[in-house]
């Protein structure tokens, strides 16, 4: 049962990793280009978490590309265990960062109306970055579950 969708060294695995990279990078760019993001810890945590996710996913995407070119099998139990731990750690960090940033964004938009009182705040970019972070997390969660499934089948 080594034919798990999203497993390392497959086209589906590579597409998951590339999607994670693209959306994590877009989330970082959206937040970093927003005025005043550095004044709020949750937004800084989101950038740090998405930056870590970008590096992790980029490294594994490169490994998938190498594996596809050389026809190497990456279904080694030790290697898959490393992928499982890395995916679950980054998934938890990304979900926590996205949730914290969503909480601050909702607070600004709906509860204290900071966005109306301080129009220089880039609330639209905060929202966009949070949405992209949740999309990134959905790809990470898919990858983490498929890695766990693959590890159980080895």
Curated annotation (Swiss-Prot):
It comes from the Eukaryota. Its main location: membrane. Keywords: Cell membrane, Glycoprotein, Membrane, Transmembrane, Transmembrane helix. It is found in: Cell membrane. Residues 39-42, 99-129 are extracellular. Residues 1-17, 64-77, 151-154 are cytoplasmic. It holds the Pfam family CASP_dom. Glycans are attached at residue 39. The chain crosses the membrane at residues 18-38, 43-63, 78-98, 130-150. It is a multi-pass membrane protein. GO terms for cellular component: membrane; plasma membrane. InterPro entries: CASP_dom (IPR006702), CASPL-5 (IPR045009). PANTHER family: CASP-LIKE PROTEIN 5B3. Belongs to the Casparian strip membrane proteins (CASP) family. Homodimer and heterodimers. This is CASP-like protein 5B3. It comes from Oryza sativa subsp. japonica (Rice). The lineage of its organism: Eukaryota, Viridiplantae, Streptophyta, Embryophyta, Tracheophyta.
